[in-house]
Amino acid sequence: MKRLLLLAILLSSLMPRYMAQTLDIYFVNAPKSVLPLLDRTARLDLMDLYASGLPAKAENLYGGQSELLEKTSDYLMLKTSDAGTWQLKVLTAGHDTLLVCIQSVEADGVSSRISVYQNDWKMVKRDMPHLTNEKFVKNSTEVTDFDRQRLMPTLLHLPIQATWHADEPVITFCLSLDSLPKEYINLAKELTKNISYKWQSGKFVAQP
């Protein structure tokens, strides 16, 4: 299986840029600047193990374990390390293909960074949803004014986490509550909301 995939990757290098490629090929061809922890051999091993229904784990370049958690025809989620994940979503915009990556790191909460590339892994500038912490705060009759005032300064400084939906071109943002004391988490959930956008006709559209 690995030989067949490697052959497909080699053949893809001979194809014109506009021709369709598979998510597997994009993943394997991602440059070191995009995915530094895994070399090509490790990536091929991960996909081979995943396709075989086995735990898709491989040693990364830092000596730790990386794991391929989920893969569809246009989505991939990788646990790069104990504190990091990397997601890839393949989007279409007319005749163009965009590769949108979410790099998330856990340190006092989960913080995400989004990068957009052409199908040859050249970075491009695209209008991505720009969200401030205030937009995640909602009114709630379940939280007293005292608790709201007490939590607000903390909510406004929490990191923002982003996640792709595996089965549709939807990205969801939320405030990462992992760093909050346990007694505050339920209150924070009552005071905050998730915000989702769907990729439609070459742009992100806010979802109700």
PLM regions and their residue ranges:
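Terminal domain-start segments
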Residues: 20-91
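Short consensus segments that form the blades of beta-propeller domains
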Residues: 78-79, 104-110, 183-188
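Short, surface-exposed coil-to-beta transition loops
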Residues: 83-86, 100, 109-113, 155-159, ...
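Mid-length scaffold segments of soluble, non-membrane domains
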Residues: 96-132
